[in-house]
Amino acid sequence: MDTPFSTLIRTASHEQHTEAETSTFMGDLLGGRLGVDAYARYTEQLWFVYRALEDAAKPLADDPVAGPFIQPELLRVPELERDLAHLRGPDWRETVSALPQTRAYAERVAECAASWPGGYVAHHYTRYLGDLSGGQIIRDKAEKTWGFARKGDGVRFYVFEGVSNPAAFKRHYRELLDAIAVDDLEKQRVVAECKAAFALNTGVFRGLGEEFRSAA
């Protein structure tokens, strides 16, 4: 395979990535047409997905395929829990709920984590590299729209304090992708799972869009 895997995976999933980024729900959220409750509900959905991702971090830490990607500075569940406590109050665990689309997403992540390290890498890539990039746009909009303190409670999910140079970190991550210890056929399967991951994420946005109809 002559094309670097990081390039292949980015190119192959471009269409699904664009569809996820341009969902009606996200457009309404970033456009200020939805209230803070919609933002909190989205944060709840993220918690379910990231819990599935990060519950697998320790078991997969020594795996030759997935292990190199598991880095403590990426972990988001503790930050999501701080955000949810701020958004929903100290008893947020009693009211938090997953949309059917979110359950399907989290279940697929857990399934890959349990039986297919390459598939886990696909989900890891689609989430964390997106958070380091487009997530910063969401943080900025949330701070301005709902008055959260800059990089404070409510938007901590988007703050990677352990990543001092995001551009360098993403470059290193792509180097890890290029060096992934799988053959070309497995790489094709990983690319297909990336597409599936974006589709699952788009499904979550669709579910949220049905729950929160824009007033626009």
Q: Where does each model-flagged region fall?
A:
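Metal- and O2-centered redox machinery and metal/ROS homeostasis
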Residues: 1-216
